[in-house]
Amino acid sequence: MSDPIIIIGSGFAAYQLVKSVRRLDAHIPIQIFTADDGAEYNKPDLSHVFSKRQTAADLVVKSGEAFATEHNVQLHAHTQVERVLTQQQQVVANGRCYPYSKLVFATGAQAFVPPMRGDGLAKVMTLNSLQEYQAAEQPLSRAQHVLVIGGGLIGVEIALDLATSGKQVTVVEPNARLLANLLPEFIALPLEQQLMKHGIQLALNSRVESVTVQGQTLAIALHDGREFAVDAVLCAAGLKANTAVAREAGLSVERGICVDLQLNTSDPHIYALGDCAQIEGRMLPYLQPIVLSANVLAKQLVGQEARLTLPPMMVKVKTPSYPIQLAGDFSPESHWQVQLSPEGIVAKAQSSLGDFTGFVVTGEYVTQAFPLLRELSQRANG
C-alpha cells in the first residue's frame, strides 16, 4: 500500500481539500494532523456570534471524528507536527515519524498582535479560531465596554456585531480611515458614520501603547496620550501565516509558503493552500480562492493536471446596517464613476486608459454586485 497523503491542519482549507479529493477518489489514503480536536465549523461566523448570542458549541457543524468517518480519513487530533523530513518524506509528530507520498500544509494563520507594553497583555484576546472564541466567550459576554484593535474587515464586522449586541465599543485603527487597504475614502466615510450611529467610538490614526490591569478593568493608553478604561480588549489587526514548520523544512517562505498555480511549494512532493499559502506572490485570505485552490490541488493529488485561474472575486463586508461588496483592482490613481444616493453608492473604477477595473457597491445597491462582477469577468476574459 502506498504512503498516505498527509494534510497538516483542520480548518476550512484542509476540509475543503478533503471533500474535493473524495469527489475524485473515495479510497486514496489521507491522514490529517491537527493541534486541536478537528471540529468542522464556519469561521466567518465568528464575526457575528455576539448579536446571535451563539456559544462556541453552537458553531460546530460536525465533530472531528464524525468528519473523519464521513470522508474516510484518519484524524490525528491534538497532534502537533513538529518537523518535516523532506528527504525521507516523513513528518514528525509527538516524537513519531509518519511517512507521506504527498504533504499539504493547510496550517492557516494566527492573529497578528501589534507590540504593546503593560501587565495586561495576557488579557488581550483574539478571535481567529473556535478555540480562541471558547477562551474569550465568558470574558466578552460579561464585558460592557470592549476595545477592538484594528479597523480592517474583521475588526469592523466584530465591532458592529458587539455594538448590535448592546456593548459599548471603541475601535483603534492606525490608518486615517477604516478598511484603508480595501476601500476608497468616499466609501469608508459613510461606513464610519454608520458605525458612529451605533455608538461606536473611533480612534483613527491611533495605536495602543499599553494595556494595564486596574482592578477589574483594563487601562488602555494610546500613543497620542488618550486613555480608556475598558472591560475587554479584542485584537483584529490582521493575520500572520503559520510558516515555522515549512521554513524549518527548507521550503521557500516569504509572507506565506510560496506556491505556484498548481499549489506546489519549492519541494515537488509538498503543497500548501489557504491562509498559509502565498500564491504567485499574493496572499488571498478569502473563501473563494481557497475553494478554487482546493479543487485544483485535489486533481493534482490524484494524478490529474490542473492549474489555478483566479477570476475577479467578490469581497463582502458583512456589516448589516451598511453592507458593502467590492471586486477587481483599484488604487489611489483610479478614476471613479460614482452614483450617490441616500440608499447607497455604486462606484466603478477605471484605469488611466478608461478600462473598467473594479467596483464597490453599498447599501441597497449591493443587488448590482453580481451584474457588475459578470461585466468585470467578461472584460478580464476578453
UniProtKB/Swiss-Prot annotation:
SUPFAM superfamilies: FAD/NAD(P)-binding domain (SSF51905). Its EC number is 1.18.1.-. Keywords: Cytoplasm, FAD, Flavoprotein, NAD, Oxidoreductase. Pathway: Nitrogen metabolism; nitric oxide reduction. The keyword Phosphoprotein does not apply. The keyword Transcription does not apply. GO terms for molecular function: oxidoreductase activity, acting on iron-sulfur proteins as donors, NAD or NADP as acceptor. It holds the Pfam family Pyr_redox_2. Transmembrane segments: none annotated. It catalyses: 2 reduced [nitric oxide reductase rubredoxin domain] + NAD(+) + H(+) = 2 oxidized [nitric oxide reductase rubredoxin domain] + NADH. InterPro entries: FAD-bd_OxRdtase, FAD/NAD-bd_sf, FAD/NAD-binding_dom, NO_rdtase_NorW, Rbx-bd. Its cofactor is FAD. It is an enzyme of class 1 (oxidoreductase). GO terms for cellular component: cytoplasm. Gene3D superfamilies: 3.30.390.120, FAD/NAD(P)-binding domain (3.50.50.60). One of at least two accessory proteins for anaerobic nitric oxide (NO) reductase. Reduces the rubredoxin moiety of NO reductase. Belongs to the FAD-dependent oxidoreductase family. This is Nitric oxide reductase FlRd-NAD(+) reductase. It comes from Vibrio vulnificus (strain YJ016). The gene is norW.
